[in-house]
A protein has these predicted regions:
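N-terminal leader segment of winged-helix/HTH proteins
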Residues: 1-41
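N-terminal helix-turn-helix DNA-binding core of bacterial DNA-binding proteins
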Residues: 31-68
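Charged catalytic carboxylate motif
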Residues: 14, 18, 117, 121, ...
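Active-site phosphate/pyrophosphate-handling residues
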Residues: 45, 71, 135
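Charged, amphipathic alpha-helical coiled-coil/dimerization segments
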Residues: 79-135
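C-terminal regulatory/oligomerization modules of transcriptional regulators
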Residues: 1-5, 134-158
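Alpha-helical linker/hinge and terminal dimerization helices associated
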Residues: 22-29, 114-125, 144, 148-151, ...
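Helix-adjacent hinge/juxtasegments
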Residues: 56-89
């Protein structure tokens, strides 16, 4: 029979293993959604960043996407602009800066429809938990994201 510290270690490992499995499935899902939308997964990730963080400079997009070549982000933004997903505009505060902004109409709306089933499935799953449990789950997810962000930065630096 497991002692309490052993049971805790096992649960921590189970949570970690499940997190990695879910992350892998998420990558595969994003590849599939990008394919359905006729874009590549880097372009899809760019749209996801703009959706969650709002307008960003090309430099900030490149850093967040892990693109190291200067022309790579230009190619991503050019493709997305031609397809109607984003537009370039001037920063209202510093007119010298260019911001890339998500265009929520048109092709992006169709992309959101593809993601609708996942969003509904998550809402159904969340219904199984109390508000207090969801608060804990959200806190863990935010903190796990921070761990992943820091580990990714460490890898890029090394």
């Amino acid at each position: 029979m497991s002692t309490e510290p052993e049971a805790r270690k096992e649960m921590i490992m189970a949570v970690s293993d499940q997190g990695r499995l879910t992350a892998m499935r998420s990558v595969l899902f994003h590849v599939g959604v990008a394919g359905r939308a006729g874009i590549n997964v880097t372009d899809f990730n760019c749209l996801a960043l703009l959706d969650k963080e709002g307008p960003l400079t090309p430099h900030d997009l490149a850093v967040r996407l892990g693109l190291t070549r200067g022309g790579a982000i230009t190619a991503v933004v050019d493709r997305l602009q031609r397809a109607g997903y984003v537009r370039r505009g001037r920063d209202a505060v510093d007119r010298r800066r260019v911001l890339v902004e998500l265009v929520r109409e048109g092709p992006y709306r169709a992309l959101q429809e593809i993601l609708g089933d996942l969003n509904r499935a998550y809402a159904d799953l969340a219904a199984d938990y109390s508000d207090a449990e969801l608060t804990v789950i959200h806190d863990f997810a935010v903190r796990a994201d921070d761990v992943m962000r820091k580990q990714t930065r460490r890898l890029w630096r090394d």
